[in-house]
Amino acid sequence: MAKLYFTYSAMNAGKSTILIQSAYNYRERGMEVMLWTSAHYGDGAAVEQAEISSRISLSAEACGFTPTVDLFTQVRAAASKTPLHAIFVDEAQFLSRDQVWQLSRVADQLGIPVMCYGLRTDFQGKLFEGSAELLGIADQLREIRTICHCGKKATMTARLDESGHAQTAGKQVDIDKQHYVSLCRRHWEDVTGLHPG
């Protein structure tokens, strides 16, 4: 039975690298896969051509999704032309709740495994919409570990401005010149001064 997987971490843990390598492994064995990534800054319901790229310079072509793209319909149409063996979704935190359920139907009704990769929380320590839904309904959760500057496991992400100061307010997604750093909870609180809850 196909499953819906969610692999999550803080920033810069290697999620995109692992996704690209996993997709390559399928293709190397002659299996067809479909890759998706957020076209977060695109508009409309059109599926855009996009690219998944990693910090270590690996890249792969992908379809881009915006919040209005019906992923179940898109995957079903593609699978009717070419049998698909797996679906890979990068930047899964940007999925809408509906899109997470659409991907669950890809696994449940079409029998195609769906592997989603994304951040768990934003720079304020809050769950992204897509991540929250995936944490709730995915068949299997996987955490990729990265480390804080102190050597402890990094579970949080801080957004720094151009001067290196932590930002504590603003849009959840911001494409301006920002720098993100992965931190353990203690150092995230020290840097941001935020104490959620």
Predicted regions and their residues:
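Walker B catalytic acidic pair
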Residues: 90-92, 118-119
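Short recognition patches in nucleic-acid-associated and regulatory proteins
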Residues: 146-173
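Sensor-1/coupling segment of RecA-like P-loop NTPase cores
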Residues: 107-130
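Short basic (Lys/Arg) and small-residue
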Residues: 138
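Conserved P-loop
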Residues: 1-78, 122-133, 143-146, 167, ...
